[in-house]
Amino acid sequence: MSNIVYLTVTGEQQGSISAGCGTSESTGNRWQSGHEDEIFTFSLLNNINNTGLGSQFHGITFCKLIDKSTPLFINSINNNEQLFMGFDFYRINRFGRLEKYYYIQLRGAFLSAIHHQIIE
């Protein structure tokens, strides 16, 4: 079973980019109660390696819906805005409920690319 990941984003200039992204107005029938101000992340790729000279962080790539944060992310990349990003990882516990078990926090992050892909 795959992980469930929610993203919260705050921009230095725009403020809360993820505010309202988990609502039915933003995502339609994909909204989840309790996650109204978070962005549902379909996939996440995190690459860190050690070459013997220290650790190197190669960024995080994530996939999300087109929602109300999409134009704000475009503004962010256009203005080279610093971002605070938090990725919350959830799993199903032994009682059948979601529990947060892992967190990745990025401070002073910048977007380097945005790709829109529509698959038929």
Q: What positions do the PLM features span?
A:
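Glycine-rich, low-complexity intrinsically disordered segments
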Residues: 1-120
